[in-house]
């Protein structure tokens, strides 16, 4: 049974999304909600993120909204190190702080500020060790930062019975097309 999922993927700028009110964000959040509801029906209790802008913070917003219907669902934010948002602009820092304030658990793997790239790798390993599955929104046709995690994930799965759901742009496009079609049908 899946009790804990780690959700990660592209940062917003890697998808060329620079505003939270972009239509793509709405579709991505609906897709994430769809995936999480499937897991909730199977017994999901915790959603973990590292607190990165993009897929992770959008996931956090979805989880916080789902808590109205699923009050036992919990959000955990496990950052690589202290101060990971210090270089973000004020608006993004405020968004993160609002989400963190409403999360059920917030901590850092390293209880220090940034020391080096090893912190990201060890945090990824921590997330794999403390979750039952990963929902990774990543398509090899558009390489970006998640490619390093994906390789670690594949290696980890070969050594364990860990599972994952790697979502490609084709799956996202199909979901969006179905969603748009159903919305059009409801207006007729």
From Swiss-Prot:
Alphabetical list of Pfam families matching this protein: YpsA (PF06908)
Domain of life assignment: Bacteria
UniProt xrefs under InterPro entries: YspA (IPR010697)
Cited PANTHER family: UPF0398 PROTEIN SPR0331 (PTHR38440:SF1), UPF0398 PROTEIN YPSA (PTHR38440)
Family under the similarity heading: Belongs to the UPF0398 family.
Protein name: UPF0398 protein SSP1297
Provenance organism: Staphylococcus saprophyticus subsp. saprophyticus (strain ATCC 15305 / DSM 20229 / NCIMB 8711 / NCTC 7292 / S-41)
